[in-house]
Every structure is written in C-alpha cells, then in structure tokens.
Amino acid sequence: KILDFEYASILIKLVVMWYVLQVFLSIIALLVKIFRLIYEKTSGTKVDESRRRFLHGVVWVPAISATLYGGLYESRNIEFVEQDIDCSAFPKLNGLKIAHLTDVHLGNFFSVRQFYEILNEIAHKAPDMLVITGDIFDSGKINDEAIKILNAFTPYFPFGVYFCWGNHEHIRGIKHLQEALSKTNIKVLNNQSIKILSGDKPLYLLGVDYVDERGGQ
C-alpha cells in the first residue's frame, strides 16, 4: 500500500507543481506587461522586442527554481535538532530524552513512506518518549495508514507516544481521527495533562487543543 501511494503521490506532486508554476508565471507575466505599459506611456518609447523576449525567457528561471525547491527539496530536507536542557534542579529528569515531532502535513508533498522513515530515524535515537504537536494527519486518503504506522512504533518509546490536535486535524475530520486514535496506544491529550514522573517534583505533560478551532476558548 505504501508503494502504491508513493507512486500516486509522485504523480500528484508533479501535477500540483505544474499548476503552482503556472500561477507563478502568470503573475510574473502580468507584472512584466504592466511594467512595459507604464514604461511606454511615461517614456514615450516602446520596449525593445528582442529584450522583451529575453526577459520573458528569464522569468521562467526563478519560477521553476522556486517551484522545484518547495516541491522537491523542502519536502525531503528533514532537519533533526537536538537540544540539551539544564535539569540540575530536577535530578530525576537527568538523562530523559524527549522527541518532538510537529507539522509533517502528510499528503501530496509528504508521503507515508517518508513518515515511516522519520519515525524510524527518531526510534534509532532511542528517546524515552515521543510528543507530537499536531498538523500531522493532513490527508484523508492516508491518515488511517499513517496512524497504523505511528502505532507500530509505540513500543520503541518506553514512556509512551503523546499527541495533541493541530488545526489541520480539525480540517480533515477530527471525529474520524479521534475514533481511529482511540484504538491505538497513542495517547491523545485534549486539554488534558498526564503525570510522567512521580515524586516531590513530578513531571506533567500537558496537551492543548488548537485554540482557533474552539472559538478562542
């Protein structure tokens, strides 16, 4: 299933990139035409046709470059950032590793295969827990498959996998996602907290819903 969607995703990605490119070119062509009309009207001379044809050819370069950069490079340029936090006042937290994943936006530009690869890379870093702060499940066609993949990785995180909603989960159908996630080992924190470590200085994890989807409440 992952392979089938991967091929379909590539085709859809190319189509979307083509339309984005057309939008870029249309905007640039319109700006060039406006500039030419203003120049001719204010200067009283016509623009050199050979130069105009050259400029029309040149405008393709930034448009194509921007489209390819956003569609191909950025969607695959995954950056892992490691941050050490001083926990000297909380000895129990020393050595605790928390992985944080957010804004993957699964869909045409980010496949379930890439999602699997990211989770696999995170698991190899051996964190104690994984916290996911929304905007992951952004495609109705592959959300269920992505949830299954995420659930399969839960044994790799001893303290658990925790999730809170982003606005794109609300957009894609929060009720279906709630039902699907309820059947997994992924813990959804919807304006809730959970105690991770007990003792005199316990550690709580709080998950907050996306505020704008609740009318600011």
Identify what each model region corresponds to.
Residues 38-58, 71-100, 107-120, 124:
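N-terminal signal-anchor transmembrane helix
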Residues 89-217:
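Soluble catalytic domains of enzymes that build or remodel membrane lipids, polysaccharides, and related
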Residues 33, 40-41, 76, 137, ...:
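Charge-rich, low-complexity amphipathic helices
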Residues 62-68, 81, 169-171, 186-189:
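Short amphipathic alpha-helical surface micro-motifs
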Residues 1-75:
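Non-catalytic terminal accessory segments
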